[in-house]
């Protein structure tokens, strides 16, 4: 059964999508894991990182073969969404799959319309739509990664309900430190709220943090990471995060090749395998797998 993990942060520009895509690619390509990336952000960044724009537009159409249709079915009581039709197998693709065991359930811009529609049903279990639709397919994968939008609205709550853990990518600075406390409190409050609806598994908790855009210049970044470690230990003692939560290493160093790889619609390990970004994500994926396998 898949380990389901939400990549989440209220802040943008912290490497959330980069971490989702590149860790997924490394796990699938080098650790022989079966990985599904579920793009839940209406910006569709994971989808467009792993698919050519024209291929993505043709695939999702008006959202029918995307996660948008999954939510619409639950809202309207229809049965249009078909997992096997919606999922793109073996992404990225050229004439053939480049990573055979990496799949994508793409987003579409129509997701912008869905929040208000979901909240019309907020007195029901609106947070369970995603899990109910994916549950029959979880045995096909070792990992399911949810690339969440930078908020804690209905779609993100669906991801949290479907997840055992969430991972918080962040840039080590003061704003990330202050924002992490709010995020940890909100995730913990939601986990307590849904605990009565989760059967046979634990409610979601923060299981790890990832450092991105790291620069070993001076001691500013090192000091910020040290402060985050102290806050993380405080939250573990207060049971706001998982007792085993840690800041995974290596830290992802700032690397132009990671940004360039988005233009090529490739994970950095396929774009420039010898870059420091590819090396960091390769090692981080190993640490990531070891960490989460020890928790399950």
Where is each model-derived feature located?
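P-loop NTP-binding core
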Residues: 1-296
């Amino acid at each position: 059964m898949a380990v389901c993990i939400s990549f989440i942060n209220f802040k943008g520009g912290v490497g959330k999508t980069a971490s989702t895509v590149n860790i997924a690619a490394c796990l699938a390509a080098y650790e022989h894991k079966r990985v599904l990336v579920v793009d839940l952000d209406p910006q569709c960044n994971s989808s467009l990182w792993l698919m050519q724009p024209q291929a993505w537009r043709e695939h999702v159409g008006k959202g029918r073969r995307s996660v948008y249709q999954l939510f619409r079915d639950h809202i309207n009581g229809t049965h249009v969404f078909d997992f096997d039709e919606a999922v793109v197998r073996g992404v990225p693709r050229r004439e053939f799959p480049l990573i055979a065991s990496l799949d994508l359930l793409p987003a579409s811009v129509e997701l912008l319309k869905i929040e208000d529609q979901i909240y019309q049903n907020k007195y029901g279990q609106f947070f369970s739509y995603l899990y109910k639709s994916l549950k029959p397919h979880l045995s096909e994968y070792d990992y399911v990664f949810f690339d969440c939008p930078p908020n804690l609205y209905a779609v993100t709550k669906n991801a949290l309900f479907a997840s055992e853990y969430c991972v918080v990518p962040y840039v080590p600075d003061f704003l990330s430190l202050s924002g992490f406390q709010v995020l940890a409190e909100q995730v913990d409050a939601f986990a307590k709220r849904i605990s009565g609806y989760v059967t046979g598994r634990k409610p979601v908790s923060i299981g790890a943090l990832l450092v991105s855009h790291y620069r070993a210049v001076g001691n500013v970044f090192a000091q910020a990471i040290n402060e985050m470690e102290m806050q993380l230990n405080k939250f573990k003692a207060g049971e706001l995060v998982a007792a085993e939560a840690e800041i995974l290493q290596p830290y992802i160093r700032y690397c132009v090749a990671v940004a360039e790889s988005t233009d090529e619609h490739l994970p950095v390990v396929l774009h420039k395998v010898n870059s420091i970004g590819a090396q960091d994500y390769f090692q981080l994926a190993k640490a990531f797998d070891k960490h989460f396998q020890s928790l399950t």
